[in-house]
Amino acid sequence: MFTKRHRITLLFNANKAYDRQVVEGVGEYLQASQSEWDIFIEEDFRARIDKIKDWLGDGVIADFDDKQIEQALADVDVPIVGVGGSYHLAESYPPVHYIATDNYALVESAFLHLKEKGVNRFAFYGLPESSGKRWATEREYAFRQLVAEEKYRGVVYQGLETAPENWQHAQNRLADWLQTLPPQTGIIAVTDARARHILQVCEHLHIPVPEKLCVIGIDNEELTRYLSRVALSSVAQGARQMGYQAAKLLHRLLDKEEMPLQRILVPPVRVIERRSTDYRSLTDPAVIQAMHYIRNHACKGIKVDQVLDAVGISRSNLEKRFKEEVGETIHAMIHAEKLEKARSLLISTTLSINEISQMCGYPSLQYFYSVFKKAYDTTPKEYRDVNSEVML
């Protein structure tokens, strides 16, 4: 006698990293539970959404951040688990079993990270209400609540929706806003994509990040880290855990378990700290300029003389001011920047160690191994094996 195999439909946009991670979480539950499910992922379900009731199978896990999906499933008579963002008002939740990413906790994690760095001015770059992204509205609400509770000054800019035809206009308006922010402001972007827009504008305007502005995103999207010169700090959502919990809950529903309407909040995984929030409370303009130059050119084999030329003051003057502000010599900071770049590439890429050594300006692989071992008490290979963030 064979157990009944359930046919389960997943309604997600597989082109989005967040959606893919939710689906991966569903897969992890199937592997762990050995459930007899046949998974159906409709690649272009929007083309047939008006007849959605004809092909749903025995149960559904769906993206309820998408209003169109929520409406299409309103009167469906199969077990449904919605996945989406949390709401600060209970009545905003859809009337289905629901697994939510905790929007308040996501923004709070970013906010606390910036506070720990010594930032005490805050800004939020969101999305316009016309975008229809309810999770963006909730994250903006969370930011306003947090700065009000802590009695900080916080400013919000929703910006424009970006498309190829208005891209430059949107970036120009973002540039106007960024130039109104006082130095040492920490900006929380509603997504990594919006954070990347900030980093691009800062580069065009020669605003040093993180010396003058700090930026943190939400999502920890793999793609974003490769598209910006300054590596982006980000809050990693528990998207896989959401998928796992959704599948686990659906399993209980398929087993006819009686339960009240479930609303499960999934907290963020952690803050992934990178260069964009590596903030030092610097006030001396010459030191800020020198630090920015070093960050951008350390791996090109620069010496102290090039830093002095870039800043335009004498060595004794800059060394004195540098020591007072940073607590290190200029030479030591160049060395530290090269090493940090190498460490970051080891854990965030699959580049060969020899290639990383060359990219970071070391004269030989042997010398790189020697310097790295002295700083971290382990070899570059051993460090990568333990700390790699790359999913192979």
Swiss-Prot record:
Residues annotated as domain HTH araC/xylS-type: 288-386
GO biological process: regulation of DNA-templated transcription
PROSITE patterns recorded: HTH_ARAC_FAMILY_1, HTH_ARAC_FAMILY_2
Keywords, sorted A to Z: DNA-binding, Transcription, Transcription regulation
DNA-binding region: 305-326, 353-376
Domain of life: Bacteria
Presence of keyword Transcription regulation: yes
Keyword Transcription: yes
GO molecular function terms attached to this record: DNA-binding transcription factor activity; transcription cis-regulatory region binding
Coiled-coil zones: none
Database matches in Pfam families: HTH_18, PBP1_XylR, Peripla_BP_3
Entry-linked InterPro entries: Homeodomain-like_sf, HTH_AraC, HTH_AraC-typ_CS, LacI/GalR-like_sensor, Peripla_BP_I, Tscrpt_reg_AraC-type_HTH, XylR_PBP1
Annotated function: Regulatory protein for the xylBAFGHR operon.
PANTHER family: LACI-RELATED TRANSCRIPTIONAL REPRESSOR (PTHR30146), XYLOSE OPERON REGULATORY PROTEIN (PTHR30146:SF24)
Protein name: Xylose operon regulatory protein
Species name: Escherichia coli (strain K12)
